[in-house]
Design a protein with these regions (language model features):
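C-terminal motif of bacterial Sec signal peptides marking the signal peptidase cleavage site
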Residues: 19-22
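Bacterial N-terminal signal peptides that target proteins for export
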Residues: 2-11
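Hinge/beta->alpha junction and helix N-cap segments in small-molecule ligand-binding domains
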Residues: 40-53, 69-79, 102, 124, ...
Length: 326
């Protein structure tokens, strides 16, 4: 009997094995009719309530997109990383719009997520990661705006303390750098930058400790949204309103009320509604293959607004309309 040639026999076995594997494998998944965009915050505050309204507007306008809004309640990297993984593993997210808490420490998490989904950073950037797009404020320029405000509030100069949640967050670093740039050569002196781990109670304690340690302090600058209200509560409790000038960021209700009362000199307001709305809209277009929305520098700056006593009523009215409140 003629024996089967050894090479041919091996090829035949390989063919049979490949055929059996292919027959037993499940068919490829069809493309999802509805894409999921996860929107992940870096903490909890009224700022993100406004951003959520923007997400909801985009969600309502896009029949082939659903938005999963995720709040980082504790403001920790670990919690935010868990929400990113949850978005991928449980929600099967096609895109994630995230405000990174620690852009350096989370680089690997962001890069790994980018292998499975479109990653957009919003509010705060992770420029050295594999994110596709950053959408938010020019935070260095916003810091310079805050510097101009505090110089107007303190024409004779004086010492100021600066407050923020976490100094390692990209927007915190850039705002502080912009503030320092604006104050170079002026009579305003920065004592230090105090952090509170995104805890409003600690923010209040920092303000109180500052007033005790530096009784001659002339001004306070809060770089995150809750810092202004935290500073104001302490000033009111110690009868220091008007004696210490306050400049802050964003448009929490207590901040706007403080401006109306003359207790806060001014605020640099971002447009979180646009962060939510534009992030979802951009993600939807990119997921459809339209990459024309991505600029050459992979950055879309949304302008910040200066709110003071002369325009706070008009701004508050527009904000209430966005939120659907009166």
């Amino acid at each position: 009997m003629k024996k089967l040639a050894q090479p041919k026999f091996i090829y035949l076995l390989a063919f049979i094995f490949a055929l059996s594997v292919s027959c037993g494998s499940p068919p490829p998944k069809p493309p999802k009719a509805v894409k999921t965009v996860a929107f992940v915050t870096n903490t909890t505050s009224d700022f993100w309530k406004v951003a959520r309204k923007g997400c909801e507007k985009a969600d309502a306008e896009l029949p082939d997109v659903t938005v999963s809004f995720k709040t980082t309640n504790e403001g920790t990297v670990e919690e935010q990383n868990r929400l990113i993984r949850q978005s991928l593993d449980r929600d099967d997210a096609d895109a994630i719009a995230v405000s990174p808490i620690d852009p350096v420490g989370q680089k690997n998490v962001i890069n790994n997520a980018a292998k499975r989904a479109l990653i957009i950073t919003q509010d705060s950037d992770a420029p050295d990661s594999d994110r596709t797009l950053y959408l938010g404020a020019d935070n260095r320029a916003a810091g310079r705006q805050a510097g101009e405000l505090i110089k107007q509030a303190l024409p004779e100069g004086g010492k100021i303390m600066v407050f923020v949640g976490k100094r390692e967050v990209q927007n915190a670093r850039e705002r502080f750098d912009g503030l320092k740039e604006s104050l170079q050569g002026s009579k305003v002196e920065i004592i230090d930058l105090m952090t509170d781990d995104a805890d409003p109670s600690r923010a209040m304690q920092n303000a109180a400790d500052t007033l005790k340690k530096y009784p001659d302090i002339a001004g306070m600058v809060g770089l995150w949204s809750y810092n202004g209200p935290s500073i104001l509560k302490v000033l009111k409790s110690l009868d220091k309103v008007g004696k210490v000038k306050v400049v802050c960021f964003d448009d929490e209700r207590e901040t706007l009320d403080g401006i109306k009362e003359g207790a806060i000199f001014g605020t640099v307001a971002q447009q979180p509604f646009e962060y939510g709305y534009q992030a979802v809209q951009a993600a939807a277009k990119i997921l459809k293959g339209d990459r024309s929305v991505i600029p050459g520098n992979k950055t879309i700056f949304i302008p910040t607004l200066i709110i003071q006593r002369n325009n706070v009523d008009e701004y508050s009215k527009k904000l209430n309309q966005l939120l659907g409140s009166t």
